[in-house]
């Protein structure tokens, strides 16, 4: 068993958990992937349409050099266990993850299977980079989601010169549109996203600004936290 700082693991799990699938037939998507190298640990969550990845340095080398997939139900229990503690112990026992804090311990079966090549999903370069105000986007999203059609709740982001338009509609009833000033001088471009996916990624960023990167309306959009260079989120846009 290896000592680990509870706050580090807790924050990593929270910032990637929202991207995990719940009952996907592709079982590897139903958990968070943990992989350690030297004194670093990487946590990844994906459901095949979005992805969240976070890296952190840890004082001790953790036993996940081959990579493990921890089920979402186990993640919930681990978070409860480590939430208010400072340090704990973690290890692998056969095909199970073991976590202990003080007198309490938890042992959970891991998900079998090969995790997808998540690095290949993250664009290496993007044509456009735009800084967004977290508050402005959250406010616009909150309103747009009310008007968006269930169950997909599609939100359209249209980038124009120095302007971002946030649109949603529900055929036959409501339509919503709001404009947010942004520093953008690229081509006129519209992207569509599942509203809840956008909302989740905006909430996951701690900074008051969000860096959004994209190359075209059909290419994956990357979201970064300016205050945390080790955090990356990706959302696949919907077809317009």
Predicted regions: what is each one?
Residues 1-240:
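Structural preference for solvent-exposed beta-strand-turn elements
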